[in-house]
């Protein structure tokens, strides 16, 4: 039998943010079940995602909110947000426009280990990142 002790709490009260105020969010294509990416959310990005039904994350490298698709056009429409049994990981089920990965692939998990312990590409390249974000200097 499942543990229903948190069922009286609101969704936001159930989320256990870490000491930096973040919670990991796994992002999955709602139609295919394919895992697209993992990102971090803080309370503000989670509230924005819940309000707008568009994925918003917290960028640790830029130290600011990141509305997915803001610069690339590759947005994520959020259909469901699930929380794990411990309350410390979220699962977003989304409809992905274009590629989810900033290097141009449909999924950030576009490489797999071979038996020889090398890597091979196992996903579809959706766009050229230089065309979308410009060349890195």
UniProtKB/Swiss-Prot annotation:
Give me the residues that bind Zn(2+), please.
85, 101, 108
Report the InterPro entries cross-referenced here: PRA-CH, PRib_AMP_CycHydrolase_dom, PRib_AMP_CycHydrolase_sf
Q: Which reaction does it catalyse?
A: 1-(5-phospho-beta-D-ribosyl)-5'-AMP + H2O = 1-(5-phospho-beta-D-ribosyl)-5-[(5-phospho-beta-D-ribosylamino)methylideneamino]imidazole-4-carboxamide
Q: What is its EC number?
A: 3.5.4.19
Q: Which residues form a coiled coil?
A: none
The protein's annotated pathway = Amino-acid biosynthesis; L-histidine biosynthesis; L-histidine from 5-phospho-alpha-D-ribose 1-diphosphate: step 3/9
Binding of Mg(2+), residues: 84, 86, 88
**UniProt-listed Gene3D superfamilies:** Phosphoribosyl-AMP cyclohydrolase
Q: Where in the cell is it found?
A: Cytoplasm
Q: How is the cofactor bound?
A: Binds 1 Mg(2+) ion per subunit.
- The answer to whether UniProt assigns keyword Cell inner membrane to this entry is no
Q: Which GO terms describe its molecular function?
A: magnesium ion binding; phosphoribosyl-AMP cyclohydrolase activity; zinc ion binding
What are the record keywords, sorted?
Amino-acid biosynthesis, Cytoplasm, Histidine biosynthesis, Hydrolase, Magnesium, Metal-binding, Zinc
Cofactor(s), by name: Mg(2+); Zn(2+)
Enzyme class, spelled out: hydrolase
Q: Which GO terms describe its cellular component?
A: cytoplasm
How this chain assembles, per its entry, is: Homodimer.
Family recorded in the similarity comment: Belongs to the PRA-CH family.
Q: What does this protein do?
A: Catalyzes the hydrolysis of the adenine ring of phosphoribosyl-AMP.
List the protein's name.
Phosphoribosyl-AMP cyclohydrolase
Q: What is the lineage of its organism?
A: Bacteria, Pseudomonadati, Chlorobiota, Chlorobiia, Chlorobiales
